[in-house]
Amino acid sequence: MTEVKLDFQKQGGLIPAIILDHTSKEVLMLAYLNEEAYQLTRTSGQMWYWSRSRQELWHKGATSGHYQTVKKITADCDLDTLLIEVDQLGAACHTGAKSCFFHPIWDEKDGKTD
C-alpha cells in the first residue's frame, strides 16, 4: 500500500469519501472519515466512518448486515477527499435503497428542474 499524508485538518478533522460500487461504478453514498475511521478501514478491509450526527465511529454493516468490503482507495489531488470502491452487501442507504442518490432533480434530456 502506498502511504500518503491525507489532509484531515482542512475540513475540521474529517475527510469526505465518495463510495462507489466496485463492479458497476454506481455512486452509493457520501460519508466522512476521521483519522481513526481511515486507519480502521485500511487495517480491516471494511468501511468505517465517522457519524457526524452521533459523533461516533460507525462500522458500516455492523447493525444492518450491509457490509462494505474495500477494493480500492484513491485520494484526490489535494489529498482531502477519497474515492473508495467497495463490494456492497445489501443496501448502502439507511432507507434500504441500493444507493443514497435516488431523488432526481434535473435531467438534461427533459431540461426540467424540480
From Swiss-Prot:
Pfam families listed in its UniProt record: PRA-CH (PF01502)
* Compartment(s) of residence: Cytoplasm
Q: What is this protein called?
A: Phosphoribosyl-AMP cyclohydrolase
**Top-level EC class, please?**
hydrolase
Q: Which HAMAP family match?
A: HisI
Q: Which is a Gene Ontology cellular component entry for this protein?
A: cytoplasm
- Cofactor annotation comment: Binds 1 Mg(2+) ion per subunit.
Q: Name one GO molecular function term.
A: phosphoribosyl-AMP cyclohydrolase activity
The pathway to which it is assigned is: Amino-acid biosynthesis; L-histidine biosynthesis; L-histidine from 5-phospho-alpha-D-ribose 1-diphosphate: step 3/9
Organism in which the protein naturally occurs: Streptococcus sanguinis (strain SK36)
